[in-house]
């Protein structure tokens, strides 16, 4: 009888091949059924040979549309964006080896933005691993390094593996789960250290208990899927919250005491508060309490209202308002969104989170702050019941934001024949309807696009916030157009970011998506150029590209393309694009010299000191330097 490495395995035993194919079809049907049951309606990917073709086929049989992308990271970003917009798990299919490796950046984005994505990959079958090294990677370890968890699904009980993957992805804090499909895996003995899987607590504690083996791997069996835990699986140093309303009040006692004493509180709204939009609006509207939003939380409080005070990123545009406050309260703030700058405000900082993992990270980032693990709904009720004592003037949030945005708009003027990034964003915003969804790539232009693009509803402004990856905007725009049909979609990207996903323009053409791609084209990695020292950092060769016509490339790929160099031309081309049945790429010539002033205003000293020396509308003199926080 031939063993695992014997002739039958090496040359392909027909009976084994038939069994393996049957296991592949069963596993594919199981994962599609679990996704469909959780509300997933689209699947993205770049398939290879092997079981993932069965997954694509099972999706089609179940009425789940498959969207072919040009790159695995782009496909994963599409899946993550659909998860962001719909709440259902995103689904992406990749092949083994290079396919999964190429998806890593997209998986990392989903991990740091806490988005539930099921990444379905082939793997070298266990019975071939002793002999086959072609495309053989330790995919469990690879998944563990960037995802919330990694599963290896064998033929014994694929339904259990599929259900587990979906539950893990959705359990707070949400995140991606890699499922390695191995229909040929034989039963192996289980070992100790297997975590006990159970439903996540309503408070958002870790989705499973127990300790994974030190190596982070577990053998595959016919009875249970192999599981490895990744960096976002849960844990942290803070205890889980007590159950019940009385316990919630106990956990929030420090917040209640701080609110009673505060005269000038400021709220920081993070993505955790997106599940409580109605309650937050009811509590804050008319309260006079300014509310700063993280990137992912934009729209919880409408920008057209009096309370929305702009962005909080850890930069300096928010500094005047926070420096004038006497209490800073964060609701659902995720430190992954904050840039690595010092947090040294004099006001006490209190962060409320529903998961101990996020709270543990918060207490490390917000120096001197207090992190509370408690239901956000209870915290919102507490804020509503403790109105502030009138230390802020009327509409302080609106006034603060208006002043900051006015300074940003006027930070720099473009040279004749070129556009400033401010010109681009304000023109596009002025000529698009309120329900437009904007996606923003990482790069210097995001420092302008994120604050200047105002929204009145959540999920209308999307960015890779935790990972801040380039190459996000176009795949995210594709997903937004598919997952929210009817809403206009605009992608803001730089020449660097578009270069990473250029062929996805063909995807928009093939799918006939009305997506407008606006390229900030200065042939430069402008954000990196600003950070370069005059010597020792590689000079122009490290940050400069040869000028390219993205409008011409778009036309070659079947999209409409237009080059613009002034606001009037941009407005005209935008109007045509919004009425076109298909995608448009607008190639905007940008003056890169304008970014230096933008960087200083948003990340440097200029943001700390408004021209008047006072916070607009507060009447409070601002300190001239940051003070160490006295919070505990």
Language-model segments: what does each one mean?
Residues 2-4, 22, 180-181, 192-197, ...:
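Phosphate/pyrophosphate-binding active-site segments
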Residues 2-7, 17, 21-212, 216-390, ...:
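N-terminal alpha/beta PP-like core and its mobile active-site loop of ThDP/TPP-dependent enzymes
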Residues 20, 128-135, 322, 373, ...:
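Thiamine diphosphate
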Residues 25, 155, 249, 418, ...:
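Short, solvent-exposed loop/helix junctions and linker helices
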Residues 28-31, 36-41, 46-58, 400-480, ...:
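Active-site diphosphate/adenylate-binding microenvironment
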Residues 47, 121, 183, 295, ...:
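Short, small-residue-rich loop/turn micro-motifs
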Residues 83, 169, 284, 429, ...:
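N-terminal cationic-hydrophobic initiation segments that often serve targeting/anchoring roles
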Residues 118, 437, 490-491:
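Hydrophobic "anchor" residues on beta-strands that sit immediately upstream
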């Amino acid at each position: 009888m031939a063993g695992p490495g014997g002739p039958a395995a090496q040359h392909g035993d027909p009976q084994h091949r038939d069994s393996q194919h049957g296991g592949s079809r069963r596993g594919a049907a199981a994962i599609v059924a679990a996704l469909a049951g959780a509300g997933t309606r689209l699947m993205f990917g770049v398939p290879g040979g092997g079981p993932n073709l069965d997954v694509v086929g099972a999706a089609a049989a179940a009425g789940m549309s498959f969207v072919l992308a040009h790159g695995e990271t782009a496909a994963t970003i599409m899946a993550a964006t659909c998860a962001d917009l719909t709440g259902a798990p995103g689904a992406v299919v990749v092949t083994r080896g290079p396919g999964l490796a190429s998806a890593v950046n997209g998986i990392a984005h989903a991990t740091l933005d806490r988005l539930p994505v099921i990444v379905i990959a082939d793997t070298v079958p266990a019975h071939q691993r002793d002999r086959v090294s072609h495309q053989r990677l330790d995919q469990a370890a690879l998944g563990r390094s960037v995802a919330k968890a990694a599963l290896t699904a064998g033929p014994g009980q694929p339904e259990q593996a599929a259900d587990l993957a979906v539950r893990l992805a959705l359990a707070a804090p949400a995140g991606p789960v890699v499922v390695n499909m191995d229909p040929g895996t034989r039963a192996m003995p289980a070992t100790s250290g297997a975590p006990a899987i159970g439903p996540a607590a309503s408070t958002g504690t870790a989705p499973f208990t127990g300790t994974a083996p030190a190596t982070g791997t577990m053998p595959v069996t016919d009875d249970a899927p192999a599981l490895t835990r990744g960096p976002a699986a849960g844990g942290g140093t803070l205890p889980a919250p007590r159950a019940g309303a009385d316990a919630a009040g106990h956990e929030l006692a420090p917040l209640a005491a701080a609110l009673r004493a505060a005269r000038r509180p400021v709220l920081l709204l993070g993505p955790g508060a997106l599940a409580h939009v109605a309650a937050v609006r009811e509590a804050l509207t008319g309260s006079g309490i300014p509310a700063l939003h993280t990137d992912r939380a934009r729209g919880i409080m409408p920008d057209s209202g009096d309370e929305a005070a702009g962005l909080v990123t850890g930069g300096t545009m928010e500094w005047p308002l926070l420096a004038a406050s006497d209490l800073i309260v964060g609701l659902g703030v995720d430190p992954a969104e904050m840039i690595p700058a010092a947090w040294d405000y004099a006001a006490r900082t209190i962060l409320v989170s529903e998961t101990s993992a996020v709270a543990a990270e918060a207490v490390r980032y917000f120096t001197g702050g207090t992190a509370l693990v408690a239901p956000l709904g209870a915290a919102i009720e507490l804020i509503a019941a403790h109105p502030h004592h009138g230390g802020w003037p009327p509409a302080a949030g609106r006034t603060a934001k208006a002043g900051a945005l006015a300074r940003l708009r006027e930070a720099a003027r473009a040279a004749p024949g070129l556009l400033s990034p401010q010109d681009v964003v304000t023109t596009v915003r002025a000529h698009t309807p309120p329900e437009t969804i904007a996606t923003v790539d990482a790069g210097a232009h995001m420092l302008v696009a994120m604050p200047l693009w105002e929204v009145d509803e959540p999920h209308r402004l999307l960015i890779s916030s935790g990972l801040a990856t380039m190459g996000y905007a176009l795949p995210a725009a594709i997903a937004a157009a598919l997952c929210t049909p009817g809403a206009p979609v605009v992608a803001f990207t730089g020449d660097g970011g578009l270069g990473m996903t250029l062929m996805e323009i063909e995807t928009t053409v093939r799918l006939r998506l009305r997506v407008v791609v606006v390229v900030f084209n200065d042939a430069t990695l402008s954000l990196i150029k600003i950070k370069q020292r005059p010597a020792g950092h590689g000079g122009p060769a490290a940050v400069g590209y040869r000028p390219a016509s993205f409008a011409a490339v778009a036309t070659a790929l079947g999209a409409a393309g237009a080059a613009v160099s002034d606001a009037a031309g941009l407005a005209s081309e935008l109007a045509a694009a919004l009425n076109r049945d298909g995608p448009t790429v607008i190639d905007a010539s940008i003056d890169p010299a304008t970014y230096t002033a933008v960087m200083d205003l948003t990340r440097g000293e200029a943001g700390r000191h408004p021209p008047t020396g006072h916070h607009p509308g507060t009447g409070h003199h601002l300190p001239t330097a940051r003070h160490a926080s006295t919070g505990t």
